[in-house]
Amino acid sequence: MSIVLKIKRTEDAKDLPLPAYMSEGAAGMDLYANVKGEVTINPGEVELIPTGIQIELPPNYEAQIRPRSGLALNYGITLLNTPGTVDSDYRGEIKLIVINLGKQPVTIKRGQRIAQMVINQVVRPKIIEVEELSETERMDRGFGHTGV
């Protein structure tokens, strides 16, 4: 099934690439940092990094914004609210809440691939309140119930 994702660049991001899939089987398309020059994030610091894009999703779709694994592994750079959700009725610029969990300052440069965006279909179920839920073998055994 094919859908259309409409993308508008902000005025200050006309020179940046559009989001792109980096391999044939990639689930997420890379997003680019729309910073002026560069931004250094010290260990433990949080920065709001703009992407320079606004999107229009079809109804009943969302965009999930996720960290890039290489940045997390090599530098401790990740997204604070992951995955971030972009709703189909949001039209503002996508911005990333980036945190440095590493031990060294990390410099983010303009145009650097900083996160990835995955498009998913959304199901909105009818919600009903009940007095009981059906029984399962697991029931309410949660965290660590299958072993560590």
Curated annotation (Swiss-Prot):
Physiological role: This enzyme is involved in nucleotide metabolism: it produces dUMP, the immediate precursor of thymidine nucleotides and it decreases the intracellular concentration of dUTP so that uracil cannot be incorporated into DNA.
Taxonomic placement: Bacteria, Bacillati, Bacillota, Clostridia, Thermoanaerobacterales
Biological-process GO terms, alphabetical: dUMP biosynthetic process; dUTP catabolic process
Descriptive protein name: Deoxyuridine 5'-triphosphate nucleotidohydrolase
Domain of life, per lineage: Bacteria
Keyword annotations of the record: Hydrolase, Magnesium, Metal-binding, Nucleotide metabolism
EC main group: hydrolase
Natural source organism: Caldanaerobacter subterraneus subsp. tengcongensis (strain DSM 15242 / JCM 11007 / NBRC 100824 / MB4) (Thermoanaerobacter tengcongensis)
UniProt EC number: 3.6.1.23
Gene: dut
HAMAP family the UniProt entry points to: dUTPase_bact
Catalytic activity: dUTP + H2O = dUMP + diphosphate + H(+)
Associated pathway: Pyrimidine metabolism; dUMP biosynthesis; dUMP from dCTP (dUTP route): step 2/2
Protein family per UniProt: Belongs to the dUTPase family.
PANTHER family: DEOXYURIDINE 5'-TRIPHOSPHATE NUCLEOTIDOHYDROLASE
Claim: Hydrolase is one of the keywords in the record: yes
Cofactor(s) the protein requires to work: Mg(2+)
